Design a protein with these regions (language model features):
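Polar, enzyme-active/binding microenvironments
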Residues: 1-328
Length: 328
């Protein structure tokens, strides 16, 4: 006797024996679920680095605990506005601007659960700054940015667990700088950027290579989205661009962003870190650089609340490095 097929209910949970991960069904697809994080004395750790004017300082904090940031160590050199990403154990800092208006091809890495100075990982194939990063447990991708040749549409990737030089991934739809990058385990999202003060959102499939595809549009944000993006495995958050606006999208589908809430004050080029439940937005220009930090709950919607303070006022640095962001 054959059994009639049954519709899978939204919210159903399964164990995928091929990937060794838990998954939840969200209406049209199965999405991986974060079910563990390294033991880091209270929860997942967020890391930010660099600053404008140029700095090599790395700071960290425990995302579930409202408190001030602490010194972690130093980058290999002073720089800001590069791309970054992480696995559960390693954080990568790619490219950047050493000032004035220089561009680097250096890639540094840290072991997130410890403290100490960054170590050489390898080099990008093309030096760049003012771009963004996307990552999952396996790969970290440097997206766009610019150098002396102008704005770039190239994407470059590395395998996080090894060391070595970056390889070509594909191209974005247009050459841009100042984008925001956010990731699920499957997809990387690229939002906003300039020139053209674009409000477009594009996506890539991290495990493959290829060109970015259209996802939808931001409602109000665009231009300087750099640093103001983060995600859980299900939802991406976009903030910054010198406004208080926070917007969100559901990563597995395509479509335009929706209103999420507001930050406590306007920020441009802030830092963002998440443990896939709480998102922390810190630093940025208000219009001068600030050391303030605020948090949101990604699974709901609402306005930012006070979190604590950075070691020093910081903007335009590296971010999206944590042990439990949406790509993990």
């Amino acid at each position: 006797m054959s059994l009639s097929p049954r519709e899978i209910p939204t919210g159903a949970v399964r164990y995928n024996t091929d990937t060794d991960r838990m998954e939840v069904y969200i209406g049209s697809t199965w999405m991986e679920v974060v079910v563990s994080t390294p033991n880091l004395n209270g929860g997942a750790r967020g890391v930010i680095a660099g600053n404008n004017p140029t700095s090599n300082v790395i700071q960290f904090f425990t995302i579930p605990i409202q408190a001030n940031a602490t010194d972690f160590g130093d980058l290999s050199q002073n720089r800001f506005v590069g791309g970054s990403g992480s696995s559960r154990t390693r954080g990568l800092f790619m490219g950047g601007d050493p000032g004035p208006s220089g561009r680097l091809d250096d890639i540094d890495f840290i072991t997130i659960s410890s403290t100490g100075d960054a170590t050489d990982f390898g080099d990008l194939s093309t030096a760049t700054a003012h771009g963004c990063g996307a990552s999952n447990q396996t790969r970290c991708i440097m997206i766009g940015g610019g150098n002396s040749s102008g704005s770039l549409n190239i994407m470059q990737f590395v395998t996080i667990s090894s060391t070595g030089n970056a390889q070509d991934f594909g191209d974005t739809a247009i050459a841009q700088e100042h984008q925001g990058g956010a990731s699920s385990p499957t997809r990387g999202l690229i939002a906003g950027g300039n020139p053209s003060t674009a409000n477009a959102i594009q996506f890539i499939t991290i495990s493959t290579t290829g060109n970015a595809q259209d996802f939808g549009d931001l409602q109000a944000l665009g231009d300087v989205m750099m640093g103001g993006a983060m995600a859980s495995p299900i939802r991406a958050i976009f903030a910054g661009n010198y406004t208080t606006t926070i917007e969100s999208v559901e990563i597995a589908s395509k479509g335009n962003s929706k209103d999420f809430g507001d930050m406590s004050s306007s920020r441009g080029c802030p830092h963002s870190n998440t443990d896939s439940i709480r998102g922390v937005i810190s630093g940025g220009y208000t219009p001068g650089s600030t050391n303030s930090m605020e948090y949101i709950t990604i699974t709901s919607s609402g306005n930012g609340l006070d979190f604590g303070d950075l070691v020093a006022a910081t903007a335009n640095g590296f971010d999206t490095v944590s042990t439990a962001h949406g790509g993990l």
